[in-house]
């Protein structure tokens, strides 16, 4: 009997060695390709399977490739109520609009900062007074970065991404204070966080946090030149960490920058007033060349309140413009406008408002501290821990 047990143990042990050898003999590129086809939650769970899988799924190349292959981007809607952050992920494309997936988390840190943010490649960056914070909604992780400069009483933060080297960088400027330097931090292991000083060579100040956008490795934001007080578009190359400056048209919303057909665009002030979306599109940064485009959008025929209570948040990869109100008190839906088909569609906020009512004494339209929407959000495998 004892000999049979020993023989059985040897067979089992041999079987395990065979399986282990078979698994380890699988080519790395094939293993990576299989993992890339899995959903984000499955990848997170499979990291504990082996050190090899952990190494593959945390490699920057894998993370960048996963993000480019992610399903269609979503509209991330956030609002704060009673110190809680509510997050809802809404598919932007038409066929899945009714099937929104929701997740909720809470943090005391969000109470004063949600209006002041930057987003890029699955990560969101914002700040509380002097402290920059980076948030990965997909992994429900956030990390507080070191204070850039003690002498800066308040700051503005921008998040940039270099697609060539696959690096995220946080850049920081003093809020409403002219400066010819900025602080830059490259995201990586938490123990290696450190700011470096970068000369801008253009003394300027900016207080329009929401105007920042990163396109093809360049961070754009609106600022005012120190000596002339002229409004300009500042450009920060994430990879080389060099600055440039472009002249701006006068009659634009200085708090709004959008991405339109892969280019940076400003929004003129006559937008919505004349049933047009009026854009100034940057064609050539080196030559300060801009083009104008008027897109007919009959807001008044759809809802007269659009002229007053809605703000253009941007243009999706599919070419739809998205308009969002700053509070549930004024509007109860998010508006999608297709400029090609000249059609409007709306996503009702009723379900989100119902969730709010549970924490607001049954009133679904009570006061909300902040309401924000992030376009073209994709899941990110980057760990902040």
Swiss-Prot record:
The F-box domain is annotated at 20-69
Start-end of Basic residues biased regions: 1-19
What superkingdom does the record give? Eukaryota
Q: Which Gene3D superfamilies match?
A: 1.20.1280.50
Q: Which SUPFAM superfamilies match?
A: F-box domain
Identify the CDD domains for this entry: F-box_AtFBW1-like
List membrane-spanning regions: none
List every stretch annotated Disordered. Answer: 1-24
Q: Fetch the InterPro entries from UniProt.
A: F-box-assoc_dom_typ3, F-box-assoc_interact_dom, F-box-like_dom_sf, F-box_dom
NCBIfam families named among the record's database cross-references: F_box_assoc_1
UniProt protein name: Putative F-box protein At1g47765
**Which organism is the protein's source?**
Arabidopsis thaliana (Mouse-ear cress)
